[in-house]
């Protein structure tokens, strides 16, 4: 949950560099941000239905694949058509947060729930604070594409390991 949260937060910070790369008029930034954030909100409304349809195992895979895939796809589509990738990413951002918090709620005793969710948010911010300067440096020294691809790897490796461990735990 923390890795996915950090991944979606990091992508939120990539939106402006992507818009700058595309030479988007600044007057459109607010419009695009608003539509992206509304996309998250509407997706969150459907998250329970989506989770019930796919179930926790498939949903975990889908979230990881679409989040990592969003970084990779955007890296290779830094065009205005690539903005559609951002919208798909933001749909999964809208699914991921309530679904993953729901899983935490199911696994946590009520007297510890607020603490666990606070620690989750702290981990997200801590991970972002740890990787953001490096990702920014990659963007400045190499390219936006490299920064996006390295971000995908930073998410995929621990995300895949932790998802695999979770599946293994649930099978035993």
PLM ranges: what are they?
Residues 42-56, 139-140:
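Helix-to-loop junctions at the C-terminal end of transmembrane segments
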Residues 26-27, 110-120:
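Loop-to-transmembrane helix entry/capping segments in MFS-fold secondary transporters
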């Amino acid at each position: 949950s923390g890795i996915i949260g950090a991944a979606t937060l990091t992508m939120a910070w990539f939106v402006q560099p992507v818009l700058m790369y595309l030479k988007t008029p600044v007057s459109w930034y607010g419009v695009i941000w608003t539509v992206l954030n509304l996309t998250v909100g509407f997706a969150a409304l459907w998250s329970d239905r989506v989770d019930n349809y796919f179930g926790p195992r498939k949903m975990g895979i889908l979230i990881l694949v679409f989040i990592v895939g969003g970084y990779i796809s955007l890296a290779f589509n830094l065009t205005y058509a690539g903005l559609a990738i951002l919208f798909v990413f933001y749909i999964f951002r809208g699914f991921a947060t309530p679904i993953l918090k729901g899983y935490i709620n199911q696994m946590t005793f009520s007297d510890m729930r607020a603490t666990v969710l606070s620690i989750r948010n702290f981990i997200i911010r801590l991970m972002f604070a740890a990787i953001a300067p490096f990702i920014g440096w990659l963007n400045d020294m190499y390219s936006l594409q490299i920064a996006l691809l390295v971000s995908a790897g930073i998410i995929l490796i621990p995300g895949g390991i932790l998802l695999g461990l979770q599946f293994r735990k649930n099978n035993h």
